[in-house]
Amino acid sequence: IWDLVDPDGVESITDVFYAVDDTCAECWDTLGVVPQLTLTDIEPGFHIFYLKIRDIAGAESSVIYFPDSANTQEPDYWKVIPVNGDILIVDDFSFDTQNNALQWFKSVFDTLGETGNYMVWELEKELPYSQADVTANLNYFKKVFWYAAYTGPELYDNASTSIEKYILNGNHFFISLAEMKDTSFTWFPIDSLVTISDIYGFSPNRVLYSQINSTLDLRTPDETGIYLDNLIGFESKDSSSFQSLYRLEFPPDDPYDPFNGIDVWDGTPNVCGVYHKQYGVGKAVLLSLPVHNGYEPLLDGNGNFSEFIRYLIDVEFESE
């Protein structure tokens, strides 16, 4: 983002010029009065964007550009990458510096034969400044699989407007999250929340019961739970648009279970559901539990998490 200034006031600026890769006399185009610019049909590879202005007296500014190697606060490269496939994996887990969660999530899609049909967007610490850029990145793909952080910052809530536009455009969206930062998602209405963990977390060897097919039941590993407090389940009363995909059953009461008495939820809370507002609009699937902690997967105790993803791709996210 660049702000235009002039000693005589911004009203004295008459022209804004931009160029890509070359600053020859014939290489400059006029930006006009629009506050932003979308570039299309750019060849894949590394590029440089140049900008300059001219005032009413005909004086031109110096040329600024991106990337600028002298600016350590910005990325030092701009690379255009061709879009491959119709699936986007969004890595919203910046604290996973070894990318263990990402490598596992990619392996799930590779196992399903989707190699070459997906791309990855690693968000790191912040989203692009413009919501238009976020929306554009999502809209290159028909299906988005977004996993939020187990611990540390996560950005999905800041992208809510773009996610809504993406779904309204007929595309499909899945998200797994550890913390429900907002319950007013317009793209996934929620009526009530249920606490399913306290300071002890969510125990190992606990089953998420599929409401579709028991072969899709998911389970936490034998020795690893989800050690986060304030995990939640959720409900939606919109029976015409909402369908539960996974519920918990009553916490087990087994004196031989080493984790007996730790789990605190009441009833059979929903932890994953699909929301489909109307024909012609895409579907949203919300899983209110994290899928990976940065060391190992958390819902693959049965070795079938990939089958759940296959179900989403082939059934829920199948084009109408």
What kind of feature is each model-predicted range?
Residues L39-F46:
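Surface-exposed, short loops/turns at beta-strand junctions within beta-sandwich domains
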Residues R54-V63:
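Short, solvent-exposed loop/turn segments at the edges of extracellular beta-sandwich modules
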Residues Y150-E249, L299, N304:
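A glycine-rich, often tryptophan-bearing local segment used as a flexible ligand/cofactor-contacting loop or short
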Residues Y256-E320:
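Extracellular ligand-binding/catalytic regions of CAZymes and related secreted enzymes
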Residues T97-S192:
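Helical hinge/lid and interdomain linker segments adjacent to catalytic or ligand-binding clefts
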Residues V5-D22:
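Solvent-exposed loop/turn segments flanking beta-strands in beta-repeat/beta-sandwich domains
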